[in-house]
């Protein structure tokens, strides 16, 4: 999933260059991701890519809210919330949602990026691990769905919206208003589910010109 990762600094979109130091069973354990534009570097340690910005890397990550469901039940809910019916697509699960990353990946046959996960969440062939502070380091329009909880910063919603592809869904906490660009499909006392509109395709009769 390295191909989806991007620099969090504001400049033109470009791939990151990977320098790998340790690999085990095809998993990257240690290395560096470098930006060819601004020359920022992001460390990969123990399989976790660290995109926390200057001054944030030393801060303790916020505590996750306790899970109200088992991981399998949470995976079923996530699959429904994010309409994860496309095998091979990529989902992003942040905070407490990330605790069920492996179960979601298996149940929906998707790739999952777990953002700021707890210690129990491990990397696998279909689950990647990220540490972030304010921005999701993802290519524009690259993911099918994003779910974040109360532990994320409000700024992260903007980068989540940017990473969401047309027709994709975003699950967010009630403490943060859903983006105006999205259509809210459902909400309860803790979360809302919203969807990005599909791109409109203009149709014209063959042989006609404007």
List the model feature ranges, each with a label.
Residues 1-64, 188, 201-210:
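N-terminal auxiliary segments of SAM/dcSAM-dependent transferases
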Residues 17, 51-52, 61-90, 96-107:
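Conserved alpha-helix/loop element of class I SAM-dependent methyltransferases that forms part
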Residues 86-139:
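Class I SAM-dependent methyltransferase SAM/SAH-binding core
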Residues 87-89, 124-162, 206-209:
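A short acidic, Gly/Pro-enriched loop at the edge of an enzyme's catalytic core
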Residues 88-92, 110-114, 143-149, 167-173:
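Hydrophobic beta-strand segments of well-ordered beta-sheets in folded domains
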Residues 95-99, 150-154, 176:
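Short beta->alpha connector loops
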Residues 125-127, 171-192:
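Conserved class I S-adenosyl-L-methionine
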Residues 154-170, 174-176:
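A short glycine-rich, Lys/Arg-flanked "PGG" loop and its adjoining helix->strand segment in the class I
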């Amino acid at each position: 999933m390295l191909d989806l990762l991007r620099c969090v600094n504001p400049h033109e979109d470009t791939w990151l260059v990977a320098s790998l130091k340790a690999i085990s069973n095809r998993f990257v354990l240690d290395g560096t991701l470098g930006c060819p534009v601004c020359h920022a570097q992001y460390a990969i340690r123990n399989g976790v890519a660290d995109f926390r910005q200057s001054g944030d890397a030393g801060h303790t990550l916020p505590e996750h809210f306790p899970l109200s469901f088992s991981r399998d039940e949470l995976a079923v809910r996530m699959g429904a919330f994010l309409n994860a019916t496309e095998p091979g697509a990529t989902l992003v699960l942040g905070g407490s949602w990330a605790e069920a990353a492996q179960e979601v990946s298996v149940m929906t046959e998707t790739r999952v990026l777990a953002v700021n996960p707890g210690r129990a969440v491990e990397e696998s062939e279909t689950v990647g691990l990220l540490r972030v502070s304010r921005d999701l380091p993802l290519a524009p329009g690259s993911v099918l769905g994003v779910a974040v909880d109360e532990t994320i910063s409000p700024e992260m919603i903007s980068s989540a919206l940017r990473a969401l592809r047309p027709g994709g869904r975003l699950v967010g906490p009630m403490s943060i208003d859903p983006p105006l660009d999205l259509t809210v499909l459902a909400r309860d006392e803790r979360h809302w589910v919203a969807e990005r509109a599909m791109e409109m395709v203009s149709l014209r009769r063959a042989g006609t010109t404007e």
